Amino acid sequence: LHCNAVRTSHYPQSQYFLDECDRLGLLVFTELPGWQHIGDGAWKDRACAMLREMLLQNRNHPSIILWGVRINESVDDDEFYTRTNQIAHALDPSRATSGVRYLEKSHLLEDVYAYNDFSHNGSNAGAKRKKDVTPDLSKALLISECNGHMYPTKSCDDAPHRQEHALRHARGLDAAYADGEHAGCFGWCMFDYATHKDFGSGDRICYHGVLDSFRNPKLA
């Protein structure tokens, strides 16, 4: 795929995966586990404990460049995320922190604003401008997801559909790298994956990958 970085989205991976990233020189953005939900005080305590475990287990992996200290796609919670950010910086002051958002101009307590940019519809700009997304222009903006569910594509779809899928990924990358405002861009996502009945294409599969579930490449 000619990628130079991977986001673990949004759960820590096996040590063997990180070992291979170290060997290959593949840069890693790894994250606190979770998706959208923030629980009560006991839940937050457990999340902080898991964050500590993740850092202590993995901070000696040279491939890791960014710690995700927010629950993926969650709302702002300044008290909780001040706490997680402080934990990460205390245990590893050498690396930057971030947290993946679907929100524009949410409270930025970390070092890098990570944003899921699903704005491209095939006929508009490939990505949003930095000034429209982050509240602090002095800090880096990273596209943590793009395309994905906006244009699900099966390996068996017709050629025009598969071609448009590839072009949408290309437009997102072009927009992110052309303006000099983005620190990088992660597409969503590498593989098609199983899901629950209320999500995806009705057959319990999300066809969001640039490869299918069996690791066969699509045009993208």
PLM region descriptions:
Residues 2:
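Phosphate-binding active sites in nucleotide-utilizing proteins
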Residues 5-219:
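Substrate-binding/catalytic cleft of secreted carbohydrate-active enzymes
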